[in-house]
Amino acid sequence: MKANSLLLCAMLFGAIAAFAQNQGVLTGQVLDKNGLPLAYATLQLEGSVQGTISDEQGAFLLKVDAGNYNLVVTYIGYAPVKQAVVVAANAETKLTVKLTEENTALNVIEVSGVRAKTASATRTLLEVKDIPQAIVVIGQKTIKQQAAFDLTTLTRNISGLNFTGNYSGAGSYQFFNARGFDLVNSQNFRWNGMMIWNLGNNYADNIEQVEFLKGPTSILFGDVAPGGVLNFSTKKPLADFYTAVDLKIGQWNLIRPAFDISGPLNKSKTLRYRVNTSYQKEESFRNKVESERYFVAPTIAWDITPRLSWNVEAVIRNSTASDDPGLVSPDGTVAGLDRLDPKLYLSEPSRKYKYKDQSYFSTLTYRLGDTWRLRSVFFYGNTKNRPWGIWPDAPDEDGNLQRNEYGYNQGLKNLSTTLDAYGSFYTGRIKHNLLVGLEYQRSRFRYTNEGYLDSLDQNNLYNIVYNQVPDIAPAETPYLPFVSVIDRAGIYMQDQMMFLHEKLHLLVGIRAGLTTQGNQYKADELPGTDYEGYEDNLVTVNVLTPRIGLVYKPKEWASVYASYAQGYEVNSPDIFALNYLDFSNPPATRSTQVELGTKASILQNRLGLSLTLFQIDKKDPYGFVYLDPANPNYDEYNVYYDGHHRSRGIELDVDGKITPWLSVTAGAAYTDTEVLEDPGYPIGNRLPNAPRYTGNIWLNFEPVQHLKGLTLGAGYFYKNRFFSSINNDPNLEVPNSFTIDLAAGYQFKRFGAQLNVTNITNQVNYLNPWVFNLFEVQPLRRFVLTLSYKFQR
């Protein structure tokens, strides 16, 4: 028996060696007209599913059977190149491919949606269509067509991702829900793959594309809520001089100039710069609401050697916006809101949400040989924000109500660093795409007070009287006698193996993660405070999270996949809960996902489709119940970490061109959520902020001959009704909503003009981000005109 086994192994290895001897290797580099590398160019063997993508230095590696081939090299905005190559057995063929730009009349050609080639958040060079996970990328095409300058406009183009409200009005920060689960401010948001806090408007003019990786992504990012990760990939310096000026003006006294300037700093163009900056000031359809923000982001890229490159970025943001709590219903129902003017303002005009952030990024990339790269990324952020607002109580039948005030200052410092190696190699006929990395993230933040509610004045819903009480802004010092801590460390590895001439892919990966979070108390500051006698309560969790996926590509343009992934969330002790001491060391929340899907590029690769089925199970979630559910008080609740919540559904994303002159970005989602176990709420309840049905479509018409330069766009965005709380209070069920948008523009040489009309039917829609009788009114009809000028040489 042993002899037979040895003979079988010998025959197997002999066969592999024989196969390998009939193969050769294609290596080389893809360059532009300046001799600079083109990252993420597609190299495809004509008539085959075999292909690859160039890395950040333009390098590529492809192992194929000996023979004659046509190698097709494509890159967005460049003329494709077809090159005949001869591959000899047991030999290496080196190529240098130079691409030239197409004449696009200064229009940047962008591919986004599900047709995007790569997503930087995957930390690999794999094409999106080859990854066993649903990924959607929103790029410049959508940003420009929809004249977007906030996240709510962009994210409505992604199926299964729902905007659920603002913290303190449109000028603060946004809440999102994905696949039935809320995204967490300290977990689910990334900038160039590095964790950032969601405490301000994260849209910025230096964003090249917004990437959404759906489902649990703990293997790459550690403890994150299972709905998905939202990553912002920034613009990089260009080798040629480029200037873009953009001015938006519109209703509600909007004025928004923006500048994008880039070019080389030396003759060899190895040192390049880019600066994005903007200023925005506007009022609102809501009475007495206004906001002002400015932004600047300088970037330097330096190709130190042909193998070593360094990219340094700074992002400075500053915003001030009116507090806007929304509306309270006269009778506690959504229907009762019809009795109120959507413009009614219930806060104080002097109350502002202030946000300041300075972020710095350093990315060092070194190419090891022709197919490996080593990358180190460092990020540091310093954030200060000051919520200061009003929380109105429910009114009596005559409209009398009490207004409460809150306010605090918060300081936050965030540091992250990653080191990863990624490369491709072969073992016999099996191609490996290996990613190995280390990651560390550290956050420290403090508050000046707990943000409790204090009574401000007695008022009336139908006749609000402002300025009854003198304003006293929240003190900037002292901080509370503790520091909130988050420390994350992880080591991860994944390999996507390609078999059968790359028709069959197997992805396996695992992450070992260590997270510590909680509160560290300062002994010298405790005496005389409510926290006297408290001790450090830090929760440490060690978790192994696996990931496995299978991809089958019957054709180069189509793939089907199945995947399984695990995720986790570390819960900090809730010091504001009345039963805080009972849960000073809460357990982690665990999640699992099974996903099946298919991706395809049809109509001669013009139109991309992604269809996904998924099920996510979340166990031991954080939950809370108010002491008096019928009359809940903001700060009177108990917490628990128990239960089983499930979400499953179907998602469709479509992006591309139906014809050469008609493009589409569309999506639809069916999301079925359910409470399977929960000590606080009935089994069978739906999860909050998760509409059962959502849909979106944006059509854009651009003539290619007659009337060239004209663009016409139209969009429809629908959201089914949903509950704002897990107790499924029918009075707080947010009704169905929709908006219709239109756009018309014209581009003449370097000049452009575009008019966008949002919510043209003037629908009054609501959200309820706070579970209480407090509804956020969504924007009414608005006209925005964009004037643009571009110069490039």
Question: PLM features: residue spans?
Answer:
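Membrane-embedded beta-barrel scaffold of Gram-negative outer-membrane proteins
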Residues: 367-369, 373-379, 383-389, 587-648, ...
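Periplasmic plug
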Residues: 130, 137-140, 154-157, 173-216
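Short, acidic, small-residue-rich periplasmic hinge/interaction motif at the N-terminus
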Residues: 29-36, 41-46, 72-78, 88, ...
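Gram-negative outer-membrane beta-barrel transporters
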Residues: 615-617, 640-726, 786-793
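Structural signature of Gram-negative outer-membrane beta-barrels, strongest in the C-terminal barrel
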Residues: 303-305, 412, 431-433, 439-441, ...
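C-terminal beta-signal and adjacent terminal beta-strands/loops
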Residues: 618-619, 659, 664, 717-727, ...
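Acidic/polar loop-and-plug regions of large Gram-negative outer-membrane beta-barrel proteins
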Residues: 280, 284, 297-367, 380-412, ...
